[in-house]
Design a protein with these regions (language model features):
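Detector for the Zn2+-coordinating histidines of canonical Cys2His2
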Residues: 243, 291, 337, 360, ...
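Ankyrin-repeat and related helical/solenoid repeat scaffolds used for protein-protein interactions
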Residues: 340-402
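Beta-strand/loop edge motif enriched in small/polar residues
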Residues: 24, 28-284, 288-289, 294-318, ...
Length: 419
């Protein structure tokens, strides 16, 4: 065989090998390009566009130990197969679903970076069942915590402290294409004040935020040490049931700004930093029922800033400064509640009007029912006020509080007082 022939054969072989390598590279590129799991290093964010995906799918697709890996346990010198460390944010795209459940996850620990919170943001659906999701600080081998001297009541210094700490959060976005269901799980040490508004910290990064995802469910969870607890804006048709909500920095449950058609039932809400359950700013068609709420610095249950056509019933509220507080809201009903050991049992205040307060048991308050500051045309009837320490019924007529109706209220060990 001539050398010329050898050169031709060698060239042909090189071309063939090159072609095969090119085909393999092109195939891999296409597979990556068409994958429903991708990673944006610039944003440090994992994108999920799969119809259904879980953490094993993400791990298999990305194979990137710097952003997602199983936890190594030094005591056993082995990997905990169901404890995951996430060092990035996640975005669930429209029409996609991310499943985080006990089949492959026991505990998801999310590490915030120095510049980003590394949130889970949902434009599709999120399904969480029987897992624990928290922030994590690998340097301290502990949750990401706010300094102990941060107190909501000291708003200026607290805001400075809160804004210095970044923590991951879960946020369901306004245009989410499906419901999010979080149940039987523990959500803790999430949320921060990384997004500020004129008068404080935005609820957008507050910890567990639902701005969309019609027919979502939050059920049978432990929710604690979250910055703002549960928060929603414009959310509709949602069930919040059977949760323990406690030790959150500001509020326990805070439906906000146009939230509507929501049921908040059978939750235990206690020891949060300011208010237990507050619905504020144009919320309507909210039912708050069957909850036990206690031990907050300010208020147990509050209707605030134009809340209307809503109900608080069959709740047990105790050991509060104000057990139930209706402020600047109208056409609501407060009935069949038991409130006890509060400075004020039921406060109707700040131009609240046309509300009905009836069939409530108000036990050992300082003031039983307190009506003031322009609250008018409200009805109070068939309430039982037992052992009020100071005043069973207080009506501040000097501040344009008028046209309120009181009928068939029972007062034991005290007499009504008009100031």
């Amino acid at each position: 065989m001539t050398s010329k022939t050898n050169i031709v054969l060698l060239s042909t072989t090189i071309i063939s090998v090159f072609s095969i390598n090119m085909l393999v590279s092109m195939s891999n590129a296409i597979a990556t390009e068409n994958s429903c799991v991708s990673y944006n290093s610039k944003e440090n964010e994992i994108s999920i566009s799969c119809k259904y995906a879980n953490f094993i799918d993400i791990e298999d697709e990305l194979q990137n130990q710097t952003i997602l890996y199983r936890e190594f346990t030094n005591t056993t010198n082995s990997f905990n197969e169901k404890n995951w460390i996430l060092n990035a944010g996640i975005r669930v795209e429209k029409d996609a679903t991310l499943n985080i459940d006990s089949d492959d996850v026991t505990w998801l620990k999310i590490i915030p970076s120095k510049s980003t919170s590394n949130a889970i943001e949902v434009d599709g659906s999120l399904k969480v069942d029987s897992v624990k999701i928290t922030s994590w600080n690998p340097e301290t081998d502990d949750y990401v915590k706010f300094p102990k001297d941060a107190k909501y009541e000291d708003a200026v210094s607290a805001e400075e402290i809160y804004t210095s700490v970044l923590r991951p959060y879960i946020k369901i976005n306004t245009a989410a294409t499906g419901p999010t269901i979080i149940q039987n799980s523990e959500l803790a040490y999430l949320g921060d004040c990384s997004l500020k508004i004129d008068n404080g910290c935005s609820g957008v990064t507050g910890g567990v935020t639902f701005n969309g995802g019609k027919y979502s469910i939050l059920k049978n969870n432990d929710i604690h040490h979250i910055f703002k607890g549960f928060y929603s804006k414009g959310m509709g048709y949602m069930l919040i049931e059977g949760n323990r909500v406690y030790e959150n920095e500001i509020y326990g449950i805070d439906p906000h700004t146009g939230t509507h058609d929501m049921i908040i039932k059978d939750n235990i809400v206690y020891n949060n930093g300011h208010i237990g359950i507050i619905c504020s700013l144009d919320c309507y068609n909210i039912i708050i029922e069957g909850n036990e709420v206690y031990n907050h610095p300010s208020t147990g249950i509050m209707f605030s800033r134009n809340m209307y056509d809503s109900i608080a019933r069959n709740n047990y509220v105790h050991d509060e400064k104000k057990c139930i507080f209706v402020s600047n809201s109208h056409n609501n009903e407060i009935y069949n509640n038991t409130v006890s050991n509060c400075d004020t049992g039921i406060l109707v205040h700040n131009f609240a009007k046309e509300n009905k307060v009836y069939n409530n048991n108000i036990i050992t308050p300082e003031k039983g029912i307190n009506v003031k500051t322009g609250a008018s045309s409200n009805q109070f009837y068939s309430n039982n006020i037992v052992d009020a320490e100071e005043i069973p019924i207080s009506i501040k007529k000097k501040d344009k509080t008028n046209n309120n109706i009181f009928e068939k209220n029972s007062i034991i060990e005290g007499a009504a007082f008009v100031d």
